[in-house]
Amino acid sequence: MNKTQLLIDKLFHKMFPNWVKYLQKDLSDCKSVLDLGCGFNSFIEYCDVPYSVGIDLHEPSIEESKEKRIHNHYFKADIRTLKLKPKSFDAVIAIAVIEHMTKEEGLALIPKMERWAKKKVIISTPNGFIRHEAIHDNPLQVHVTGWDASEFGELGFKVNGMFGLKQLRGYEGYEKYKPAFLWEIISGITQYVTYHFPRLAFILYARKDKIN
């Protein structure tokens, strides 16, 4: 990306905030966050969270995340069998995680997340099934299931659409058209529509506030 593209990109994100801005806002009142399936590059890095714990089953990803000092503490564990005390964290998040699980496993995990959270639960996942193969020698990266907005709505979540129109994305979620830089901007602009109509979006952003 040249200097002109960098300048345009900077101005664009100032005019059209990406989904990380919504995550930052949702976590702004949280002092502790549990990041399930944190991976090697969690978006928590861009949030002002005093204390966070990352959990992942892929040890190389944990080690890489440790080097970046994204979380305060890390645990290698299978989130499908994880056991924690109720209300252990202000927020429990699963960013790009449940699509790597069977539907049954995902539906079993969500109520656990609600029990572990004091204030809110946040989940993001592709809208529908998106093919994705293993990366970084991590078989856990393979996509297994697809989810739609209505499923989260039935579970009491508020759902918004992120990353613009799904129709603009191709294999593994990359921009379908060229030049990718231009279509990334166009995709960002369409988020003004998909935010309110998540069924059209590439990514679903679901959140539920706990009422204690």
Model-identified regions with their sequence ranges:
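N-terminal, positively charged/glycine-rich alpha-helical extensions of SAM-dependent methyltransferases
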Residues: 1-4
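S-adenosyl-L-methionine-dependent methyltransferase catalytic module, highlighting the catalytic core
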Residues: 6-9, 14-17, 80, 102-212
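Conserved SAM-binding loop
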Residues: 22-130, 206
